[in-house]
């Protein structure tokens, strides 16, 4: 999608929609929001909607970073403690590996 051809109010509307979509436990949408609108927020000449786009881009980046840290911590904790948690960990797993490393 080429957002450079869209008018500035449409860019703000898209950025806002992607920001609020990220609250539905979709941190990837926040990451896309940062990638698509970073140049609009920080590298383009000033325009009236730029401050709002900049705010949504910054909040999306913070949300993406937060989810990245939380998911990484959960993956490390689960992988290192899976066998110690016994049946509880098996109920949380889709694929149950044999034994432990």
Curated annotation (Swiss-Prot):
One biological process term in Gene Ontology: amyloid-beta formation
Gene Ontology CC terms, in alphabetical order: gamma-secretase complex; late endosome; recycling endosome
Residue ranges of the TM segments: 18-38, 58-78
Main location: membrane
Description of how the protein assembles with itself and partners: Component of the gamma-secretase complex, a complex composed of a presenilin (Psn) homodimer, nicastrin (Nct), Aph-1 and Pen-2.
Highest taxon, organism lineage: Eukaryota
Keyword Lipid biosynthesis: no
Pfam families named in the record: PEN-2
Record key words, sorted: Membrane, Notch signaling pathway, Transmembrane, Transmembrane helix
Keyword match Transmembrane helix: yes
Topology versus the membrane: Multi-pass membrane protein
Protein name: Gamma-secretase subunit pen-2
Protein location: Membrane
Topology Lumenal: residue spans: 1-17, 79-101
InterPro entries with a match to the protein in the record: Gamma_Secretase_Asp_P_PEN2 (IPR019379)
Function, in words: Essential subunit of the gamma-secretase complex, an endoprotease complex that catalyzes the intramembrane cleavage of integral membrane proteins such as Notch. It probably represents the last step of maturation of gamma-secretase, facilitating endoproteolysis of presenilin and conferring gamma-secretase activity.
Entry similarity comment: Belongs to the PEN-2 family.
Topological domains annotated Cytoplasmic: 39-57
């Amino acid at each position: 999608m080429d957002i450079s051809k869209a008018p500035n109010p449409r860019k703000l509307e898209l950025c806002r929609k992607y920001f609020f979509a990220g609250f539905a436990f979709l941190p990837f949408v926040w990451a896309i929001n940062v990638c698509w609108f970073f140049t609009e927020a920080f590298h383009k000449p000033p325009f009236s909607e730029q401050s709002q786009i900049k705010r949504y881009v910054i909040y999306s980046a913070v949300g993406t970073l937060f989810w990245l840290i939380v998911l990484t911590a959960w993956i490390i904790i689960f992988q290192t403690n899976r066998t110690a948690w016994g049946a509880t960990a098996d109920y949380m797993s889709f694929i149950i590996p044999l034994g432990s490393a």
